[in-house]
């Protein structure tokens, strides 16, 4: 029976703005996510406090976390990825002193996890930042935000140093190229130069956070977090092969800086060719040398790349502008399903960086049907996850050093891209619909029992 390494971390992943709710409770400020209630990737619509948005309550994890963590423990989780809402700690982002009520909430959350022997994996910034930093400073386009983020990072490292040993800096940092407001707090019509300058500030902030973590939590580890956007050439034409190399570099560049400590030559050429002159100081270059300890990433799909401009035009409707792969099936939301691609990506990242890897998001968004007896027979989710985990196990056999696996949305949550409840990922069903109706009651899906067995057998129960 093939199993995973003994110290392997099994669990699930969430984000504060998609589960917590309590969006203005206990002194929390508005975030970029709060002002975009019906689609984080859409236009910014500044909300008035009190206006109704589905994320205001989300799944009410802020008040129900003991129940949810108990359910995670029942499944056998030894790891849970959560994020801290920056605006709970610094409501406007630029305060001199943190909000004690916000700090106290995460103390209680981490203590509850410890009671169940669940290791926290904590993201500092998961698709949100204090809205006041966007309004008053222009988001990550302003160099001052680096200092505000470093203060926030140092504050939480010092507060939770005894409780949290695994940290991540920015969720899917490469998504800023596709959704600037979500990633760096810039309008969607920002120029490439503006977006890359904001990304540069974020990369410096990530490195400064790594330095702070190494100083304050010497036995801790801090990683980056990439959207694993593996691309295949649509054909074996040399032009398609080279275009694929370039497209893969567009996301690998973030990992290159965070793992190697400097800008790669291909990006410096890209900046030259596109007339992008970044403000990079000597202090920035020195800061970037502080690299991450491990690489974490999300994996949902692969796509194809072609140098054919007509085919590319048709692909620009989806957020990553990928050409569909004719050899793969797709989910209800059009995401192509490619388990072997996960093994390929693990090998690509391991060969490139030789640093430990961590799969911190993977899962299937689907519409679940509640039967008359209350059961939810999500065999499609079981099949999807089983097939991906089999390939993960093969990658470990290939020699990849993998720390763990946290499925995305182990409990149903509000989706990031559309602010929907109907796009469900969880092993645990939450009774709430897209309009916010429902009791918020939790119930176990068929996949709950399946994942429990996978964890109990350390992957031995997976079907080849």
UniProtKB/Swiss-Prot annotation:
The organism's place on the tree of life at top rank: Bacteria
Pfam families: Glyco_hydro_1 (PF00232)
GO CC entries: cytosol
Biological process, per Gene Ontology: carbohydrate catabolic process
Gene name for this UniProt entry: casB
Protein name: Phospho-cellobiase
EC number: 3.2.1.-
UniProt source species: Klebsiella oxytoca
Keywords on record: Glycosidase, Hydrolase
Catalytic residue list: 172, 361
Record InterPro entries: Glyco_hydro_1 (IPR001360), Glyco_hydro_1_AS (IPR018120), Glyco_hydro_1_N_CS (IPR033132), Glycoside_hydrolase_SF (IPR017853)
Family: Belongs to the glycosyl hydrolase 1 family.
Enzyme type, top EC level: hydrolase
One function term, GO molecular function aspect: beta-glucosidase activity
